[in-house]
Amino acid sequence: MQFDYIIIGAGSAGNVLATRLTEDPNTTVLLLEAGGPDYRFDFRTQMPAALAFPLQGKRYNWAYETEPEPFMNNRRMECGRGKGLGGSSLINGMCYIRGNALDLDNWAQEPGLENWSYLDCLPYYRKAETRDVGENDYHGGDGPVSVITSKPGVNPLFEAMIEAGMQAGYPRTDDLNGYQQEGFGPMDRTVTPHGRRASTARGYLDQAKSRPNLTIRTHAMTDHIIFDGKRAVGVEWLEGDSTIPTRAAANKEVLLCAGAIASPQILQRSGVGNAELLAEFDIPLVHELPGVGENLQDHLEMYLQYECKEPVSLYPALQWWNQPRIGAEWLFGGTGVGASNHFEAGGFIRSREEFAWPNIQYHFLPVAINYNGSNAVKEHGFQCHVGSMRSPSRGHVRIKSRDPHQHPAILFNYMSHEQDWQEFRDAIRTTREIMHQPALDQYRGREISPGVECQTDEQLDEFVRNHAETAFHPCGTCKMGYDEMAVVDGEGRVHGLEGLRVVDASIMPQIITGNLNATTIMIGEKIADMIRGKEALPRSTAGYFVANGMPVRAKK
């Protein structure tokens, strides 16, 4: 089998590349995905409100676990990643948040990455998007990814929480992806107008999968990339339960889009990475790149939960006797409780003046429950998910064997810096202040978690150690740049090799201020044009907010 391009991983970036490259009818593409199809009849991945279900099993989730995290009471922590067509866009929380403009401007400070500034990237965010209320300078109107906005009257808690943020002195913003990210406001989501999850399998592959020049193989577990000297010339993988490898040749390039956990694993198994690590497993060294698998970053978050004094939360939706009606409303009408992910409001703030752009993110949820559906509070409640955005902590991903089925050693080193602890203490105290504003007086009951007895720095720190969880945003393990730990250049090409790129969240040099899916899709769109030799889309002229020393919040 021979193809022009072989793409490893049908996720948030891989599906973008597969779709854009096959727009050229003479270009042949093989798309390899270790998981299965995105079964459209499976409510677990298609119903927005069911977002916790895919995380509970292993059909759609790699269900990685970290090594014992030394600063988190040695907990082994969840590290869920999507498996199947759509990748993590098939199992994520569907929050469409691009990050802050200054995140990208910060990337572009590095020599060689100048064309990754916000205004250079904004046209690619727009290209990917169809927003339900139409296009403008910040949003697209005819892209593959369906984005919906929050509508008034969904749940009174959303507006009350936004109002409480304003009463605490923080700004309101009507578009967290528009002119100003900083502040509290409604949250856009990757959901179709018919109430279905808008993964990249639905948005991109649906338009491409019937093309004769695109071949899609599911249940295809990549073993390694094949090299001829320093050039990537093909891929070897295992199909289904087979132990006999299948091979295909890439006439032009191999495009690695397996994500922040799997992409460095595949490079390491293929002989690209830290020479000492590869020697440990008798893997012949193709090219030494010490940065492969390093620079691992994530967002850590915790839940502050409150009893709700009025019966307006989603608690009744958790009762089994209400679920058939909710399911029918969603299935036949694409409406009702099932048609929303219920992360319809949130915000970004600076916890201290020293931060030039927001360092704390909020997601508001009108029910008290863990993200993976566990530990639901058995009463009406609501919660804030809150966490820091740009932790200085760094971890790694390293293979444990040559077996592609064996999970790697993953260590985030969460909370390894004093800045982390200061930010989380600030976050808890600020959240409590917001939750005690007049806008929430009629709803707010007792504090369920952490509980009012948790007040001192030591008590807050212990709560974080025991209860903070991943926001499922790993990135950075094949970072873009030109220093000694960089893995790819500004076009995703692996340093020192030919015919090989990495295109996914692993190439982010620094984690962004917000959820990763939208930016991973943008990366796919931008590098697709580079691969095709197309001129970059014209740089945007849209304005964007810079705090520039403004106070963190207004004085009361």
Curated annotation (Swiss-Prot):
GO biological process terms held by the UniProt record: glycine betaine biosynthetic process from choline
Keyword Zinc on entry: no
InterPro entries membership: BetA, FAD/NAD-bd_sf, GMC_OxRdtase, GMC_OxRdtase_N, GMC_OxRtase_C
Recorded catalytic activity of this chain's protein: choline + A = betaine aldehyde + AH2; betaine aldehyde + NAD(+) + H2O = glycine betaine + NADH + 2 H(+)
GO cellular component: membrane
Catalytic residue positions: 473
Pathway(s) of this molecule: Amine and polyamine biosynthesis; betaine biosynthesis via choline pathway; betaine aldehyde from choline (cytochrome c reductase route): step 1/1
SUPFAM superfamilies in the record: FAD-linked reductases, C-terminal domain, FAD/NAD(P)-binding domain
A molecular-function term among this protein's GO annotations: betaine-aldehyde dehydrogenase (NAD+) activity
Needed cofactors: FAD
Pfam family, one: GMC_oxred_N
EC number: 1.1.99.1, 1.2.1.8
Positions that bind FAD: 4-33
EC category: oxidoreductase
Keywords: FAD, Flavoprotein, NAD, Oxidoreductase
Function comment: Involved in the biosynthesis of the osmoprotectant glycine betaine. Catalyzes the oxidation of choline to betaine aldehyde and betaine aldehyde to glycine betaine at the same rate.
Family indicated by similarity: Belongs to the GMC oxidoreductase family.
Protein's name in the database: Oxygen-dependent choline dehydrogenase
Organism, as annotated: Escherichia coli O127:H6 (strain E2348/69 / EPEC)
